[in-house]
């Protein structure tokens, strides 16, 4: 931590000159754009500054003053993490939110498609009459398209208004709580408009159009007869008479509603993915800190400004630099290139002088395997490098490439005695602080995960509760569709003397069994879906790497949440069953 204090001139004179450092900031007369141009400009400036200081020091020495000046640190903008990290961090947040956004849109489109399909089933007689009266299929398609598309458009407009007004401060404060940011000006963002408004409307339009076109292909006569399928009626499955009557009745309900239960399963699958995605990140960040600890190279990783020797036992020299990735499918990543000693005590892997090993994160994120070529480039020049991967090394703290120190020196044309720092498990006390650029410890390695927890904390709560709400709504809507499609059968059972509780035991119990089965079966599928989403989308839209890890407790929570949600929904459906009149059984009877 840094503390700033004011002192009088007289008080400042009492401060030892050994502890005084003069800091200066500079700004280019002409704007420099791009890291490569900034590197060239900053090197020119440093060279000129060095010449000026050298000339000044010469004059001091000639005047008998030995307190000469030197440059102890130099930090241009393009290497300043305090300036660049916030933008990079927001970029990964954006990728996460966009993935969540598209999952939600798919869920909503699915709900509208199911609702529209159910509406067509209920109004089949009316549609058949209209078709027989001369109305074209395209006219009916337009009629049923209006509501879902109009609702989506209104919701998108209202969402944009809320995003730029009432909710603006909330999301701004998420980042103000994490970073020391300057004041901001709200600007309309075309990309955000496309992602949150145009894309959802297109998805909604296409999904509903496909459903309607498929449903309305039937002839008017079939609509009038309520025969809403081209498939021939299947023969009834024979059930053993040894089974109790209520069990056979319940099984018959399940067999008759297989298409509805498949729709319910698909809905639970999508909603389950939404819930797990919204609750997985907090434990994932904690688990990430644990795997970083386990794969940490050493307790203290010294990075030096200039070479300095140490007599400490156990200290091991290494080389390090960074290169950029070239694959245009992904955002540009900084890859740490380590040159390590032969038979290293800290990096326990056997590497030959003509090969390289990559961290497991590189393998997973870029979909690489042994024998593949990994292309990298110098971010400040046109020089490119091609490395053939000989294997992987478990190192989760960063995206890294490991090679022998000799190979590093040959590859980057360094002196034979060149090194960048030391790996060690204890502090080095015989190296002057002026030679030390930084010391990387476990606390430094997990700063990223801690920062993610702070910056994403409030956002994750929003995703979590929103995901749960969507789960409940989807469960309610889909189970409601099943009751409505069986309204005539339920009405008939009432005429036969069944009570509301008994009917609920038949229809709701059958659906409850299918809900539990769907929740359990969906667990491995949701896991595979999210893993695919990480590798195919999230990794391409963010810098850095965080492994895909989902605790089992997240899936257990999904199943329990689904059961609890359905228990609430079942009560509501029991009320709905009680309101179905017996007269429904007399309607639409062939």
Where are these regions (language model features)?
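Short helix-loop junctions at transmembrane helix boundaries
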Residues: 159-194, 516-584
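Short coil/turn motifs that cap or connect alpha-helices
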Residues: 136-137, 219, 369, 499, ...
